[in-house]
């Protein structure tokens, strides 16, 4: 583990030079990677980025969590304050504009070290606040791709944590439906952060169901709960039956489809949970889109909870909205205990 962390080198010289400056907030979208490299290196750098950031939302068409925007080295100066910047080069050809750029960015000793040893350099807040900056400087494709297994999960965690930090500030800090949040806590013993613009579609707390939504695009988040441990946390068949019956029971006019249906064990806010994802479709109209659910038992409140999210946004990007809803769902917390 120590060795792996050592592989993620820090651009110390720039931190020393720039660390005392007051930096403005990083620019750009939270689902876009700015990748700066010369044309001959694009395919290799693309394969590296794709192999690290391989999470995909099926809508049902595949939609990556991060879009890749390639920029030639001469455009670097105008985009260096973007939120997610990757600067890459393969080989040491001094006529390669990407190599020229990296040689300007790195001290000679560090430049040679990346070619001979670890090809990845990573840091935070280099030119802007809440920025992630990655340098990829490899001698060859083989050297670069060989570095992926040791770094993949660590790098993904850095980027996903930064996404959560920046997006939480965007969706929660300006205004929230605090009165609804307080009512949920007092009435149901749990609450969650509800951003301004989200409306209560249905409050059936007497039977353990609460549903909020937002337009432009259409987004739904619902919570269903029951007293006691009503699921078998080990038996996937039991969870599957719970999921398949959910939309027709609580939404009535939609159902889940078996295309790209996926169930996996994991955690929801440090509680063991099932994570279920797939595609929903309307029973009445040609409509559909992605959904995501978490099912878990909370021992402190002695209740089983099911949080479900779905979106309808035909022909447009959906992944960033699904990830925003995931942040809303994960703001869920129990406020009353047994």
What are these regions (language model features)?
Residues 1-8:
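Bacterial N-terminal signal peptides that target proteins for export
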Residues 9-14:
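Hydrophobic helical h-region of N-terminal Sec-dependent signal peptides
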Residues 16-19:
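C-terminal motif of bacterial Sec signal peptides marking the signal peptidase cleavage site
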Residues 21-23:
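Bacterial signal peptide processing site
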Residues 34-40, 55-59, 69-74, 195-254:
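Secretory pathway targeting signatures of secreted, lumenal, and periplasmic proteins
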Residues 75-82, 88-138, 142, 246-302, ...:
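Signature of long, low-cysteine stretches enriched in small and polar/charged residues
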Residues 145-169, 198, 304-338:
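Surface-exposed amphipathic alpha-helical segments
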């Amino acid at each position: 583990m120590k060795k792996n962390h050592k592989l993620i080198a820090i651009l110390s010289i720039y931190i020393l030079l720039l660390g005392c400056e007051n930096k403005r907030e990083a620019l750009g979208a939270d689902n876009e990677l700015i990748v700066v490299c010369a044309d001959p290196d694009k395919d290799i750098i693309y394969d590296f980025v794709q192999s690290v950031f391989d999470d995909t939302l099926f809508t049902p068409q595949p939609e990556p969590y991060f879009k890749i925007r390639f920029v030639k080295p001469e455009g670097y100066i105008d985009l260096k304050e973007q939120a997610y910047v990757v600067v890459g080069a393969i080989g040491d050809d001094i006529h390669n504009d990407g190599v020229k750029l990296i040689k300007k960015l790195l001290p000679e000793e560090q430049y040679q070290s990346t070619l001979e040893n670890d090809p990845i350099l990573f840091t935070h807040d280099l030119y802007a606040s809440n920025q992630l900056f990655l340098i990829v400087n490899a001698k060859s494709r083989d050297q670069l791709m060989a570095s992926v297994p040791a770094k993949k999960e660590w790098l993904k965690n850095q980027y996903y944590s930064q996404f959560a930090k920046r997006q939480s500030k965007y969706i929660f800090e300006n205004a929230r439906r605090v009165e609804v949040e307080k009512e949920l806590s007092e009435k149901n013993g749990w609450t969650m952060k509800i951003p301004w613009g989200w409306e209560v579609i249905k409050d059936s707390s007497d039977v353990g169901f609460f549903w909020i939504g937002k337009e432009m695009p259409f987004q739904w988040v619902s919570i269903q709960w029951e007293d006691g441990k009503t699921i078998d946390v080990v038996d996937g068949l039991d969870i599957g039956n719970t999921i398949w019956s959910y939309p027709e029971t609580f939404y009535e006019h939609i159902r889940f489809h078996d295309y790209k249906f996926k169930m996996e064990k994991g955690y929801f806010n440090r509680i063991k949970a099932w994570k279920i994802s797939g595609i929903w479709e309307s029973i009445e109209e040609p409509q559909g889109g992605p959904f995501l659910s978490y099912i878990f038992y909370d021992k402190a409140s002695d209740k089983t909870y099911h949080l479900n999210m779905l979106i309808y946004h035909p022909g447009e990007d959906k992944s960033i909205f699904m990830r925003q809803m995931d942040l809303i769902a994960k703001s869920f917390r129990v406020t009353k205990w047994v």
